[in-house]
Curated annotation (Swiss-Prot):
Gene Ontology annotations for the cellular component aspect, listed alphabetically: cytosolic large ribosomal subunit
InterPro entries: Ribosomal_uL22, Ribosomal_uL22_bac/chlpt-type, Ribosomal_uL22_bac/org-type, Ribosomal_uL22_CS, Ribosomal_uL22_sf
Keyword Secreted: no
Subunit structure comment from the entry: Part of the 50S ribosomal subunit.
GO molecular function terms attached to this record: rRNA binding; structural constituent of ribosome
Pfam assignment, any one: Ribosomal_L22
Family affiliation: Belongs to the universal ribosomal protein uL22 family.
Classification via PROSITE patterns: RIBOSOMAL_L22 (PS00464)
Species this chain originates from: Helicobacter pylori (strain G27)
rRNA-binding listed as a keyword: yes
Protein name (record): Large ribosomal subunit protein uL22
PANTHER family associated with the record: CHLOROPLAST 50S RIBOSOMAL PROTEIN L22-RELATED, LARGE RIBOSOMAL SUBUNIT PROTEIN UL22M
Keywords: Ribonucleoprotein, Ribosomal protein, RNA-binding, rRNA-binding
Region ranges (Disordered): 102-122
């Protein structure tokens, strides 16, 4: 099992979590391939972090699963923009911490019905 962590990336955690939920439990090679064709800044960042996690463990991407993919909120950079009549309004520039954990395994993301059957003990 290997991990990769990218901290203080200028990316909204809310938007990044949408992509992170999609790749959790996927094969690493398939996840990287699908992220490359996703037109989103978060997809580019997550693709690099997944590739880094695979490289950190000296693993083969074809036989590696993404065990967990977590995006936490980092500090918010506060900026101001001038407005009419001498006022200024705040601009929030959020940052994120991206954490990816991968492990050897060949099982793909299982379906909801399969998970339900496992929970019931069938």
């Amino acid at each position: 099992m290997s991990k990769a962590l990218l901290r203080f990336v200028r990316l909204s955690p809310t938007k990044a979590r949408l992509i992170a939920r999609q790749i959790q439990g996927m094969n690493a090679e398939l996840a990287i391939a699908s992220l490359e064709f996703t037109p989103n800044k978060a997809a580019r960042v997550l693709s690099k972090v997944v590739a880094s996690a695979v490289a950190n463990g000296s693993l083969d991407a074809k036989s590696t699963l993404i065990v967990s993919c977590r995006v936490d909120a980092g500090p918010v950079l506060r900026r101001s923009i001038p407005r009419a009549k001498g006022r200024a309004t705040a601009i929030r520039k959020p940052t994120s911490h991206v954490f990816v954990e991968v492990a050897e395994g060949k099982e793909m993301k299982s379906s909801k019905s399969h998970k339900k059957n496992q929970a019931e003990g069938k």
